[in-house]
Swiss-Prot record:
Family statement drawn from the similarity comment of this UniProt entry: Belongs to the UPF0251 family.
Top-level taxon of origin: Bacteria
Identification of the protein by name: UPF0251 protein swp_0615
InterPro entries (UniProt xref): UPF0251
Length: 100
């Protein structure tokens, strides 16, 4: 039986719903979905330059889980950029505390 999901503190909201290559209609693109917690990990780790320990504490998760989320998010972004896929960003109405 899988472990129950923990509540995670999310403070960042994506300004757009999707990023895609210019000139290609989105209906023709393969899409990669990035989760809200992966998006938050990218923001804290790469944009705000927080250490993994501090970023994990701010999200309310372990450092190892934060590392997994960050690696997964980076892979999805790199795949979308290098292979010309659309990147679907998370859209959430409540970014203070979300059950993921």
């Amino acid at each position: 039986m899988p472990r129950p999901k923990k509540c995670r503190n999310l403070s960042c909201r994506a300004p757009y719903s999707m990023l895609k290559p210019n000139g290609i209609p989105s209906v023709e693109l393969e899409k990669i979905h990035i989760d809200a917690d992966e998006f938050e990990a990218l923001n804290l780790g790469d944009v705000q330059k927080m250490s993994q320990l501090d970023a994990a504490a701010s999200m309310g998760i372990s450092r190892q889980t934060f590392g997994y989320l960050l690696a997964s998010a980076r892979k999805k972004v790199a795949t979308a950029i290098t292979q010309g896929h659309g990147l679907v960003l998370p859209q959430s109405t409540d970014t203070k505390r979300e059950v993921l």
